Amino acid sequence: MAQVCSISVNHRHAGIEGIERARFRDPDVAMLRLLSLPGVSEAVVLQTCNRVEIYAVAESVEDIVGFARAEGMPLEIAEVRAGDDCLKGLLRLACGLESMIVGEDQILGQLKTALLQARRLGTIGPVLSTAIQKSIHVGARARIETEINKGSVSIGSAAVELAESLLGDLRGRTILVVGAGEMGTLVANAMAEKSLRAIYVANRTFEQAEKLASSLQGVAIRLERLCDYMGSADVVICATGAPHLIITKKMVEQCKGEKPLIFIDITNPRNIEETVGEVPGVTLHNIDSLRQINEASMRRRQGEARKVEAIIEEELVLLQRDIRRLHADRVIGDLYQRTDHIRATELRRAVARLSTAGSLTEQQISILHDFSMALTNKILAAPTRQLRRAAERCDEDCLRTAEELFDLWVEESNGIPGNKTKASKTD
């Protein structure tokens, strides 16, 4: 029977190189390819700077593992989950407990984006839609009822905290932020509170850089003029969504001034060439360097995390119930479809046989139709009640037995239950 399962390569077991290896060049293509596999009925891909995750509804976890292996995901550092373990992991993720920066809020927006994209592509169905929507609800509830997101709760704010720990004090410093999107904005806003000497904002779209810089009393610069400002900066934080290098070793060698320069790259894929750290007087940090910030964050939030865990346990029971109901609804739907196909076929035969003895009136045919519908519904009423009760008490065996007893298989040519191919695409 189909179940929810996931494969995740994330910061807990992989460094930035491992996460880069796991990334899909085109997540949309990956979702469509995954959905095309036999036994897979739903698929969602979630990619952030700290994780690459596949969520699917599949007959077997091995279906997803085989897909991930073929796509080149490093399974030796991946987490594979199925069933309730997968559902609980999704709730923990939305609550920020699985994040590098515990309690960070950005994951909720990332989950919403993944959900909407899967809907647009048509790769998601009722099970994953229910699970992800529930996770977003639980994540919001956790942040309202606890202080899990109090303090530095984003990669951006953690990068600022890292810069502060490296320099001791940011007052009077000059900061260059590369990127004016969501993450760049978080960094720039956090930096603006530190009594800086100057803050520069560079972005591919200059108008966006101007908008952000003006809100902070900073200076917007064009991306091609990075070198003109890099030499005067104390810290350069790269926070773009670009899939390629923006700052190279050669560029830094040409642009660096006399004073030490710190680079912090919080992107994935990385935007700063790894060899930049070899330039004399230059220090390069990436997402892996933020682990120390996360450890401190986790220590501060241990009490709040326990409160969140209690919320998760409570909501997990409700999610499990909802998923079971979906399974029961699918079995009941298949049962009614199978029965209605038989009813309609036999009704046509009865009308044809009666017509040989003389023409039937429209009223007589209507009476026969109503009779067949009433008979079918009354016969199925008790099995329907029992199947719903089975779902409530977690009796998967009962649901599976019903599928076998009523021969609930889908005919490939017309989608009518009663032939050879199992109805996994609606699970």
From Swiss-Prot:
<feature type="active site" description="Nucleophile">
    <location>
        <position position="49"/>
    </location>
</feature>
<comment type="function">
    <text>Catalyzes the NADPH-dependent reduction of glutamyl-tRNA(Glu) to glutamate 1-semialdehyde (GSA).</text>
</comment>
<protein>
    <recommendedName>
        <fullName>Glutamyl-tRNA reductase</fullName>
        <ecNumber>1.2.1.70</ecNumber>
    </recommendedName>
</protein>
<comment type="similarity">
    <text>Belongs to the glutamyl-tRNA reductase family.</text>
</comment>
<dbReference type="GO" id="GO:0008883">
    <property type="term" value="F:glutamyl-tRNA reductase activity"/>
</dbReference>
<dbReference type="InterPro" id="IPR036343">
    <property type="entry name" value="GluRdtase_N_sf"/>
</dbReference>
<feature type="binding site">
    <location>
        <begin position="104"/>
        <end position="106"/>
    </location>
    <ligand>
        <name>substrate</name>
    </ligand>
</feature>
<dbReference type="Pfam" id="PF01488">
    <property type="entry name" value="Shikimate_DH"/>
</dbReference>
<dbReference type="Pfam" id="PF05201">
    <property type="entry name" value="GlutR_N"/>
</dbReference>
<feature type="binding site">
    <location>
        <begin position="179"/>
        <end position="184"/>
    </location>
    <ligand>
        <name>NADP(+)</name>
    </ligand>
</feature>
<keyword id="KW-0521">NADP</keyword>
<keyword id="KW-0560">Oxidoreductase</keyword>
<dbReference type="InterPro" id="IPR036291">
    <property type="entry name" value="NAD(P)-bd_dom_sf"/>
</dbReference>
<comment type="pathway">
    <text>Porphyrin-containing compound metabolism; protoporphyrin-IX biosynthesis; 5-aminolevulinate from L-glutamyl-tRNA(Glu): step 1/2.</text>
</comment>
<dbReference type="GO" id="GO:0019353">
    <property type="term" value="P:protoporphyrinogen IX biosynthetic process from glutamate"/>
</dbReference>
<dbReference type="InterPro" id="IPR015896">
    <property type="entry name" value="4pyrrol_synth_GluRdtase_dimer"/>
</dbReference>
<keyword id="KW-0627">Porphyrin biosynthesis</keyword>
<feature type="binding site">
    <location>
        <position position="99"/>
    </location>
    <ligand>
        <name>substrate</name>
    </ligand>
</feature>
<dbReference type="InterPro" id="IPR015895">
    <property type="entry name" value="4pyrrol_synth_GluRdtase_N"/>
</dbReference>
<dbReference type="InterPro" id="IPR006151">
    <property type="entry name" value="Shikm_DH/Glu-tRNA_Rdtase"/>
</dbReference>
<dbReference type="Pfam" id="PF00745">
    <property type="entry name" value="GlutR_dimer"/>
</dbReference>
<comment type="subunit">
    <text>Homodimer.</text>
</comment>
<dbReference type="GO" id="GO:0050661">
    <property type="term" value="F:NADP binding"/>
</dbReference>
<feature type="binding site">
    <location>
        <begin position="48"/>
        <end position="51"/>
    </location>
    <ligand>
        <name>substrate</name>
    </ligand>
</feature>
<dbReference type="InterPro" id="IPR036453">
    <property type="entry name" value="GluRdtase_dimer_dom_sf"/>
</dbReference>
<dbReference type="InterPro" id="IPR000343">
    <property type="entry name" value="4pyrrol_synth_GluRdtase"/>
</dbReference>
<feature type="binding site">
    <location>
        <position position="110"/>
    </location>
    <ligand>
        <name>substrate</name>
    </ligand>
</feature>
